[in-house]
Amino acid sequence: LVGIGGMGNVHFNCYKKIKNAELVAVCDVRKDFALERVGSACPVYTDIDEMLKNEEIDVVDICTPSYLHAEMAVECLNKGLNVLCEKPMTLTCADAEKVLAAAESSGKKFMVAHVVRFMPQYAFLKKVTDEGKLGKLISLDMRRLSSVPRWSWENWMQDEQKSGGVCLDLSVHDIDFVQSVLGMPERVSASYRPLKNDSSFIKSTLYY
């Protein structure tokens, strides 16, 4: 597990409940902070290269700040490791292509940790849509509101160049679910207002 901040800690507590998974190491640049959360559960590292060198690892779970996802994912895939990565996958299309290329060339699995599609109510909607029990789904309206995140390390989430802002950090949940139900859209239109005075906005329309 790389990064044990907000989402990293959530993942850490989930791994403790999975009987057929063994968490072999945690890596975070804040060693004292990590030790406080991990305790004696597993070794703690501050350097990902040292962790990958010393431990026998099947899967690396990347829960670092978003702007670090691409570099770490490519490194782990190139070392022959499967990767689970917190959303967003990357902050640019170019970096996403690099990650996909590394996954393809390595033959290893890469998954973005989109959680919404696995939530019971969302999974049920997809199931009845796939089965056609309620007829054809012709429109899907999804809305999401959130306060500005103020809990991140060094406030990186408030920097849209590091987090991707409301588009890649928040709206991405709904975009992923829509695509899981309806597939890739034929075209997309969107309007966006950058973060200003604690307010940001995006409206996306996916056409099928």
What are these regions (language model features)?
Residues 2-11, 62-63, 142-146:
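Short, conserved structural micro-motifs that define repeat-unit consensus positions
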Residues 116-196, 204:
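Predominantly a Rossmann-like dinucleotide-binding segment in NAD(P)-dependent oxidoreductases
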Residues 21-25, 58-60, 164-165:
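Short active-site oxyanion
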Residues 11, 43-102:
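Beta-loop-alpha module in the N-terminal Rossmann-like domain of NAD(P)-dependent dehydrogenases
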Residues 97-115, 135-140:
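Rossmann-fold dehydrogenase core element
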Residues 1-39:
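N-terminal Rossmann-like dinucleotide-binding module
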